[in-house]
Amino acid sequence: MTSFNDGRTVHVVIPARYGSTRLPGKPLVDLEGEPMIVRVHARVRRALPEADIVVAIDDARIAEVLDARGIRFAMTDTGHASGTDRAAEVARVSGWPDTDAVLNVQGDEPLVPTALLQAFAGFCGATAALGVATVACPIGEVALLDEPAIVKVVVDHRGRALYFSRAAIPFCRDGRPADSAGSNGLFLRHIGLYGYTNATLQALSRAAPCELEQLEKLEQLRALWLGMPIDVMRWPDAPPAGIDTPDDVARVVSLLKRQTHDATEPY
């Protein structure tokens, strides 16, 4: 089982909710012969071969697929509003110590780079006072600042999050930033990986959603609302987008068919 240098055990939870308005049965969508959740699990296992990995599910149809492949899973409440709450239930029911680290990897990201997962696990391990951790990369194209589906984050001089928003932050009062500003490290795009101590995860799950979280539909704002620091790891570029719609499925399948990838990072 993976542990940090200070002895803290590392668990990885992959939340997988069957119901999806835009793509019902999303975890089981076929991606070149394998259900998506199986591909996500394989990617995490390849990145962190010694980690304690649990898929947090809410439907017997997912359980059947995972059980047939010998993949560890935990059935969770169907009423959870977020993957954070689903991960918290797994940690609580499993009796993990408060000091253990829990990495939350989204179940709809079948192409998340193994190098990113490894780097993030290392980042969490190197953060002595780990509370909440996440990832961001340069926005790249300045036009993406205006895309509400792209979540932006502003950090302080320590690399801790000041705010997350679907709006353009920081706002440039004197007009649109130059195209080169997209790579200067000031305009950052959030990448939805999370790490916590179990104590922090449980505190987040127990807290009621805050007004900012409900307004922006961004669960990480709950941590900031509660005064919890969020340490942000920098990554050089955005990973391939996840799956939310049938069009996304077609895009990922096309990538898998074309096999335009580094041989060390098979899709």
UniProtKB/Swiss-Prot annotation:
Q: Which cysteines are joined by disulfide bonds?
A: none
Q: What does the UniProt keyword field contain?
A: Cytoplasm, Lipopolysaccharide biosynthesis, Nucleotidyltransferase, Transferase
Q: Look up keyword Transmembrane helix and say if it applies.
A: no
Q: Where in the cell is it found?
A: Cytoplasm
**Which InterPro entries has this protein been placed in?**
Cytidylyl_trans, KdsB, Nucleotide-diphossugar_trans
A biological process (GO) of this protein is: CMP-keto-3-deoxy-D-manno-octulosonic acid biosynthetic process
Q: Which GO terms describe its cellular component?
A: cytosol
Q: Which GO terms describe its molecular function?
A: 3-deoxy-manno-octulosonate cytidylyltransferase activity
Write out the pathway annotation from the protein's UniProt entry. Nucleotide-sugar biosynthesis; CMP-3-deoxy-D-manno-octulosonate biosynthesis; CMP-3-deoxy-D-manno-octulosonate from 3-deoxy-D-manno-octulosonate and CTP: step 1/1; Bacterial outer membrane biogenesis; lipopolysaccharide biosynthesis
Q: At the top level of its lineage, which domain of life is listed?
A: Bacteria
- Catalysis: reaction(s): 3-deoxy-alpha-D-manno-oct-2-ulosonate + CTP = CMP-3-deoxy-beta-D-manno-octulosonate + diphosphate
Q: Which enzyme class, named as a word?
A: transferase
Q: What is its EC number?
A: 2.7.7.38
User: Could you tell me what this protein does?
Assistant: Activates KDO (a required 8-carbon sugar) for incorporation into bacterial lipopolysaccharide in Gram-negative bacteria.
Its family remark reads: Belongs to the KdsB family.
Record's protein name: 3-deoxy-manno-octulosonate cytidylyltransferase 2
Please report the organism this UniProt entry assigns to the protein: Burkholderia ambifaria (strain MC40-6)
